[in-house]
From Swiss-Prot:
This is UDP-N-acetylmuramate--L-alanine ligase. Keywords: ATP-binding, Cell cycle, Cell division, Cell shape, Cell wall biogenesis/degradation, Cytoplasm, Ligase, Nucleotide-binding, Peptidoglycan synthesis. The lineage of its organism: Bacteria, Pseudomonadati, Pseudomonadota, Gammaproteobacteria, Enterobacterales. It comes from the Bacteria. It is an enzyme of class 6 (ligase). Pathway: Cell wall biogenesis; peptidoglycan biosynthesis. SUPFAM superfamilies: MurCD N-terminal domain, MurD-like peptide ligases, catalytic domain, MurD-like peptide ligases, peptide-binding domain. Cell wall formation. Its EC number is 6.3.2.8.
Length: 483
């Protein structure tokens, strides 16, 4: 089968005789594609250097996964799907080219799925994973049986992906390398646009904005774009968008406007004014933070557009279980320290790795728990991001009470002098005293204990492998975390 036939193939209906190999199968998007294809009946294999929750799940389902890259792995493949993170000199890619085995990008495979469905693509610099999860939960809990492939684990199904049998296909659309231009959705949600992954856009923010505009202008005339008009970059491209647009935000001009926002602990509530609806909507959301109110409003706008009853929207968001590593409450850390008796601290795990995301998380914690001592354990993600947003990081990271900085998670990038953790540590140290460079993560407790006073929140922050600290250093027992 050549690549053009593959791209026209209806994988939901055709005979399931193809053997498909995924290089980089451990990634959230790639593992989701593997799960969907396997559940459709195709013979799936994959390779990666990393073993994680999803690879274990896929192996238990019966998918053959190799934890090394070798040309032997692709011997029987009819075609190959690759993650954009896989370099061109990968031995499996080189072997596939030599044997003329068709190679598809992850986003190209998403489009193959999407072309036979009502495609819903969620993109933006921040919030797309949570928004995708919310849209899925609203549809799924109301028996609309969507298919979803998300960038994070949806807690209600304990998976990144699920095969449904309705017309709806929801996908998180990755803007980081422009590959979302492969998609042709019926509906697109853009949460925000900020300078990130800017090296993939020749260092030009205007090129990133233009790429988002090009993506939105692929929506057909009968489709719709749902956009957050609190974001300046979205406002900038808004007049050039050709399809129907629904706007949302705190902005007074938004069609779906958030008012009367309040939060307490892990719950937020707000009133949603819908200018084209007869009634306002009172929302209780099982997540704190104004940014999550925005994510929920994007999902509400879509659900309203799909004529889902208000009560069902309300109940879905009230019962929303969240997404793994997105402001995720892990448990309590009970302190064994002579100066502190019978005290425990909260442990929160968050994937945010951009200064704006860090700022929103800090603001959310300060609003719900203003008197808590906030300790952040932060792992910078990518040298290029650290370099490009260096002074923003210094400003935001200086706002926590105590900061522990791990080494940069490189994501296969080369070292950049002045964009490393020591540089961040040195410059933040000029502003605040309570900052520590963690050179040995196995000794994290030794670094952490002096900063605890018994009234603390420990925030584990970053997109790399920082979450393994929870599993390797803290012991989970009876839903509580103990030293």
């Amino acid at each position: 089968m050549n690549i053009n036939k593959i791209k026209k193939n209806n994988f939901f209906k055709e005979k399931k005789i193809l053997k498909i190999h995924l290089i980089g199968i451990a990634g959230s998007g790639m593992s989701g594609i593997a799960l969907i294809l396997f559940n459709l009946g195709y013979k799936i294999s994959g390779s990666d250097l990393l073993e994680n929750f999803m690879t274990k799940k896929l192996k238990n389902m019966g998918i053959n996964i190799y934890f090394q890259h070798s040309e032997e792995n692709i011997k029987y493949a009819d075609f190959i799907i690759i993650s954009s993170a896989i370099p061109s000199d990968n031995p499996e890619i080189k072997a596939a080219k030599k044997k003329n085995i068709p190679i598809l990008l992850r986003a190209e495979m998403l489009q193959i799925f999407m072309q036979f469905k009502f495609g819903i693509a969620v993109s933006g610099t921040h919030g797309k994973t949570t928004t995708t999860s919310m849209i899925f939960d609203i549809l799924n809990q109301n028996k609309l049986d969507p298919t979803v492939i998300n960038g994070g684990l949806i807690k209600s199904i304990n998976s990144h992906a699920k095969l449904g049998f309705s017309k709806y296909f929801i996908a998180e659309a990755d803007e980081s390398d422009g590959s979302f231009l492969c998609l042709n959705p019926t509906t697109a949600i853009i949460t925000n646009i900020e300078p990130d992954h800017i090296d993939n856009y020749n260092g030009e923010f205007k090129l990133l904005k233009k790429t988002f505009l090009d993506f939105l202008n692929k929506i057909p005339s009968y489709g719709i774009a749902i956009l957050c008009t609190d974001n300046k970059a979205i406002l900038n491209i808004l007049p050039k968008i050709k399809c129907k647009v629904i706007t949302y935000g705190f902005n007074k001009s938004a069609e779906f406007r958030i008012t009367s926002y309040k939060q307490s602990d892990f719950i937020s509530n707000f009133t949603l004014i819908r200018k084209k609806q007869l009634n306002n909507l009172e929302i209780i959301l099982n997540l704190p933070g104004e940014h999550n109110a925005l994510n929920a409003t994007a999902a509400i706008a879509f659900a309203t557009y799909q004529k889902i009853p208000d009560e069902k929207i309300y109940q879905s968001l009230k019962n929303f279980k969240g997404t793994s590593r997105r402001f995720e409450y892990v448990g309590k850390l009970f302190i064994k320290k002579k100066s502190i008796q019978n005290k425990s601290v909260m442990l929160i795990n968050d994937y945010g790795h951009h200064p704006t995301e860090l700022s929103e998380t800090i603001k959310t914690i300060r609003k719900s728990w203003p008197k808590k001592n906030l300790i952040m354990i932060f792992q910078p993600h990518r040298y290029t991001r650290t370099r490009n947003l260096y002074f923003d990081f210094i400003k935001i990271l200086s706002q926590v009470d105590s900061l522990l900085i791990l080494n940069v998670y490189s994501a296969n990038e080369s070292f950049i002098s002045g964009a490393d953790s020591f540089s961040l540590y040195s410059d933040i140290k000029k502003i605040k005293k309570n900052v520590i460079l963690v050179t040995n993560r196995n000794l994290i407790l030794n670094y952490l204990l002096p900063h605890l006073n018994g009234n603390d929140i420990i925030l584990i922050q970053g997109a790399g492998d920082i979450d393994t600290i929870i599993n390797k250093i803290f012991i989970l027992k009876n839903k509580k975390v103990i030293i």
